[in-house]
Amino acid sequence: MEAESGSSTSQDSLASLTAGDVLVRSTGVRGVKGAAGAGGRNSAAVSVTKLREALPSRQAAGVALSRGETPCEPPVPSSGASNGRVTGVTACSAAPGVWNAKGHPEHLLLVADPVEATSVPQMVYPKEAAVNPKEADRSLQPEYSRRPKDDVLISRYPTGQKEALRAVLKQKTRSAPVFKEVKVQLLGNASPERKESVGQDPILTHREADSATTIAAATAAAIATTAPLLKVQNDLQAKVNCVSTLLHKLQETDKQLQRVAEQQTNTKTQHEKPHCHERVSELEKQMNAFMLQRIHHLEKLQEHQMNIQSHFISSAVNMGGLQQTHMPSSGLLTKQSEKAEEQLLNNGISSSQKNFFPSSGLPTQGDGRHLEHILNPQAAPWGQMESSEKTMLTNDKMSWHSEIERPTALQTDSCPAYENSSQNCNSIEKTVKKADDLLQVLGQLRKEMHDMLQEASSWKSDMNDLIKSKPATIASDPPEYNHLVKPSVLQNVKAPNSILSDAKRVLREVQSRKKVLEENLEAVLRAKGGGAMSAFINALTTNRDALEKIRIRKAVDERIKAISAEIQAEMARNDMEQVKYDQKVPWIKRAQNIKAMKNSKEIKAKTQKIQGCSTKKPLSAAKSLRNHVEDNISKEGFRTYFSSESLQRNRKGTDEPMSGCAMVQNEEYLSQIYGKPIYQGHRSTLKKAPYLRFNSPSPKSKLQRPRVIEYVRGTKVKSAGTQTCSRAQKAVISSKKQHPLYALAQENQYFFSPNRDVPADCGPLEGHLIPMAVPLGQTQINDISVQPAGVVMCKPHPVTVTTSIPQVPPKPPTEVKKPNVAVIEMRSEKKDPPQLSVQVLPNVDIDSISGGSVSVNHVLPEPKPARCPADAVIQAPEDIQSEEEDVKFPGTNFTDVTDVVQDQEEERDEIPEFTEPLLEINGHFRVAEPTYNGPSFPPVASAPQQSCDVLDEWIERRETIENRLINWVEQEIMAKIISEMYPVQRETVPSVSTSEGEDSETVTSDIVEAAGGGGFQLFIDAGVPVDSEMISHLVNEVLSETIATMLGNRQAQEAVPATNLLPSTTAVMEPLVPTPLPTPQATPPQTPPSEKEMPPVQTPESSPSITELSGDVREQEKMKEAGSDIPAAVSRVGTPVITPISTPPEIITPSPPASEAAKMENPAPLNPWDDAELPLEEEKPSPLAEETFNPKAVEMSVANDEEPEALILPSWQSSPKPFQSLPCEPEAPSAAPTDSSEQSTQESSLTPTETETADRPISEGEVLFSCDQMLAAREGGLSFPNLTESLTSTLQDANEMDYDPPSEGQVVRRSHKGYHRDPVLALLAKLNQAPVAVQEGGYHLEDSDSSVGELSEGQRPRLTRAAERILMGHPVDIDHATARASEDRPYQGSRSPSPGQLTHPAEILGDADTSHGPMLVAELESQPISNPVLQAAQPSCRVASLPKGPSQEESQGDARVVRPRVVHVRRKSEEMQEEGEGVVPHFHSHVSAERMSVKLPSMNIDDQTQSLSSIHGDSDSSGADTF
């Protein structure tokens, strides 16, 4: 039919619709076909039908059209059609099988697309829909009573395209949405309304279409966002609707039955005789009675079933007598119930009914079978004692089937019957029978529904009631069964599933769950246990203390040792044989080694399978190696040995997981770690080897088993892992778990494969080996070391190993503590095997175990010499070395490469503390001693001491060198203090050579001295941080010292006065300088006591290096010894008027030792003026200074030919001047640096005298201040008025200097901002900090007043009180000043005073007079000029270079930190006098002009050198110099 096709079409289209797709459609319904026909039909009954199908809550309310109407076809918009969607009104979609008596389906108008009901405008025509009242609120979606005939299509947009949707909406939206009311109309009025709606005004429809489009779009957008929620809600509602639909169907069925009855009565009245009516009425009565009987019967059956269940429940509760007592009753009950049922069936059917019904007593036609189906499932449980749950399910299923199938039966059977009833009375009877069947089915359905509801509501309460009332109920069962007529459904609650079955089921579930839980628990416990064990093992492996590891290692080693003593003995013998064999056939041996590697891998794999232990692998590796080395030894013995050993280790594995690594010193293990036994080329196996993971925690080297060691002579190489021996040596050592010493057997090459962690410096750091297993074949060979007969180049470290056994007893015992590369020269000469003896190498910390170097490995117990020589293999050393290498610092190891051969005994005696040898060399060897106990070669270099220095020669010469070093260091320190040639930074204890013969090498370092050029190269090759620059620098220094010595001490002396000399330095030189008559008074002879009592002026700046301090102390002591004359010198010598030109040559200081002389020469200040000619030679740095390699600060004095103003720098410049250095010098009224700062402030203003500070060359950039400026600065902190105007002659560009990058020694001008009260900051703020910092590196202390560690302004620490007092010009205790002076200028102590310099320390002036430390010009100015000499410009002004009183020295020390250059401004007359006087400077009391010397930092050594040259020859000051 049309309706059917429409419904099917809509259903199909609806099936294709999905919630994800949101069609925004505004559909105008075209004229509905058949509308007129529909209108023609008038249904007798108008009823609002309820939805038959579960519909989403959002779906349009189902519309039930009257039977007579033809459901309208669902309109199919083109868009919907194109999309495969049809939204429309479907007829009979909910009740597919229900037809009216005339064959018309019940019309249920349903929106086809329940999913999209919310998003799609309702397709139900307005005023057509009878909205289900329950869903009215949900169906109030925009509906349009009027729609255009033409459909308006709206594009389809995915849910996420909001922007596109908005754009379309904007385009299409022409008017505000018009909302229409949804009118609920009866179905009968639908067609007229429809016609009206078709004829609506096109304008209105158009507007509405637009508004509908807008609304639809908006609705679609909203729906798209809420689609998921709606979908869920729809699902829930659909389920609810399903339930409600069932109820509706039941109700409708009842109504249909009523209708059928009515129709029957009508038809009977119309077509039948009265007799038929009577019969029909009788049939109805009988049917009603029968239905009642059936209902009662069903109720009784249910009671019966419940009673049975109750019985079983009670029997379950009372397992004993109840079950026995009542079981028979259950059988009776079943029989009685059956009989009762039969009675019901037979008695319930009257004779009249029998005529209509088949003799069977139950209608079999149609769906009569349902009754049987219903009864049978219910009866079945009686015999089966099954839970009623199945029955419930069956009933539910049957009820559904009955609901679905009965309507079909009705429409198929009843409709024709009624049509033909008028023709044949038999048809009435059939109809009556079917009606009876229907009634029966309905009764069953009613009962079933009732039972279902009742059961659901009373399940829980019934359970409790049944359990409680079982006994009584069971007792009363027979009477109840006798009274089946009573409806008992309500009286007796249907029993739930029997307790026994439930209990059984629950018990099974519990048991299964318990089982699962137990299994899970076991799994969890296993996991936890495994995790705990692994954690424990890991903790043991990784977190174990070094001592614990060592202890475990020892225990394991001892046990293994005991187990394998015999095997080790055999291995030792085999090793000896193998060594001989290797010596004879090295190449064959190499091939064997390769095979051994393969075998070792195979054996390792096998052992791993057997042991499954990491320690096993190393053991197996060792085993394979041993097998190859010991071809004669039965493999079975090895297997047994290794298995036992591995088992023991496995036992200990948990306690000592890392012990395996230590144990794994076997050759195979080594081969695995270090690659192919030949050790040539890259060892690819290292990457795969598991040991690397254990490397860092690698057990410390195991006690060395005694090894037969060939006499090996060669440089000691510390390998990160172990020192490898040549293959031949390996034969001897191989039995001892061979370390990487196992090297190229044929070539006797040693590979040092560092097992230890890669030192932070893997590069050419001294002695640091790369702990990682790197193909050692690449290691660099130390060029200096003796070329081994067989040399394997290992990139990580140049390792030269001569496998041949050198006649010289081998010195290269490797230090276990620090696995540094030990260069083992195995001389090709192979000593006779008889010489071979197994020696246990004590662990030797060649590096003099640096604190960091003490690693777990280092904490090795004494070597276990007990091990058989074969077992002497270093087990832990690889790991230990890797750890130790990190600790050892580069440079310390290779300090000396010496050819000295020491006996093993000596070496051992020297190094008794090292119990475990890292290097195990086949042949005779000596344990490397900590080669150098003194400060490590470059103190700046890493703290680790010489880790793997070549020990051969060094060990023999070590004591001699140390003794020489002690003396030499003392001498050198004194010489350096005097000359200040070496920067404290560069100070290297060994490097400074005492003897001039050694000067070149010694200066370079003791290492060079001991090792020779080749040895020093070894340091470099080994990675020692000695730069070629450093070496060349050291050599140059030595050369410069030698040249200076050759030139003579005179220049050095000149340089000394030029630089601020420490009192100690002055003391040394003092005897040479005759005291001039005039000025000594100004400088009271307090100085000599001051030297002793030097107030400890603490330079807040960096303290001198330890060596420097020690040097100072020694120098002071020596100077006190040599400087007993100092007191005489203390009396100040009046500065002779002699021109400074003569001064430099005149300075006659007792020639210091050659080294000192050289150093003194070096101290000669560089010519800060560069090439500019200085007006006075005084300004020129003494020629000695030229020789000075790195004079730190060049003090240059420029004789002021010009007015003092010219000498005076603008105060802004002066402020930058570190007058701190000035304070360093004693306040000699004329020239003392401190005095010069104060005095010069005064004096410089007095006259433009030559500014020569006692022969001091004026460094370039040095600024001279007039006394006026100094005074002003002292009074207020540096005020910076533009003083450049006074300096116009010399400082015309001073103001511009602010904008120029500061020159080397330039003082940066400071803006005039009042007084900067921090003396240090005030000066440093002005100083170019960079030059100051450079000076630290570039200049020697001799030439600078600043200490080595002196910091630039920002870096400089706050001055101590004493320092501030010095800066402020307040006297500090003389002793401290002396101490600081000596500390700051360790090398000056020995220098002789320059001719003008007073040999005795200047007397300490008042606070104003003496500056105790570097002073700011402001501070100098701020201080009252207490020094009467300065204030009066006494003719007795001291020469600037006068030996500084302790206070001066102290101030110098402080100033030295600042590294200012102090330019002493003296009167030319003084300088002339000095020059004229020659060596005996005497100050003329009538010096008219005062010199102010400002010591400025000069940053460039070259500049300093130039300044020196200028000091010597150039009268012109360099452009950088400012006066």
Curated annotation (Swiss-Prot):
Chain spans, region Disordered: 1-20, 57-84, 1070-1112, 1137-1262, 1294-1313, 1373-1410, 1498-1523
Compositional bias ranges of the Pro residues kind: 1073-1088
Annotated region (Required for centrosomal localization), positions in chain: 498-585
Family label: Belongs to the TALPID3 family.
Compositionally biased residues, Low complexity: 1137-1149, 1236-1251, 1507-1523
One term under GO cellular component: centrosome
Tissue-wise expression: Ubiquitously expressed.
Annotated coiled-coil segments of the chain: 428-466, 499-528
Comp. bias (Basic and acidic residues): 1373-1386
Keyword entries, A-Z: Cilium biogenesis/degradation, Coiled coil, Cytoplasm, Cytoskeleton
Protein name per the record: TALPID3 protein
Disorder association: Defects in Talpid3 are the cause of the spontaneous mutant with pleiotropic phenotype including polydactylous limbs with many unpatterned digits, vascular defects, hypoteleorism, abnormal dorsoventral patterning of the neural tube, loss of endochondral bone formation and embryonic lethality.
Any Gene Ontology biological process: motile cilium assembly
One Pfam entry name: TALPID3
Disruption phenotype annotation: Failure of formation of primary and motile cilia in ependymal cells of the prosencephalic choroid plexus. Centrosomes are rarely found near the cell surface but are often mislocalized deep within the cell and do not show coordinate orientation within group.
Biased composition range(s): Polar residues: 1-16, 1099-1108
Functional description taken from the UniProt entry: Required for ciliogenesis and sonic hedgehog/SHH signaling. Independently, involved in regulation of cell intracellular organization. Involved in regulation of cell polarity.
InterPro entries linked to this entry: TALPID3 (IPR029246)
Compartments reported by the entry: Cytoplasm, Cytoskeleton, Microtubule organizing center, Centrosome
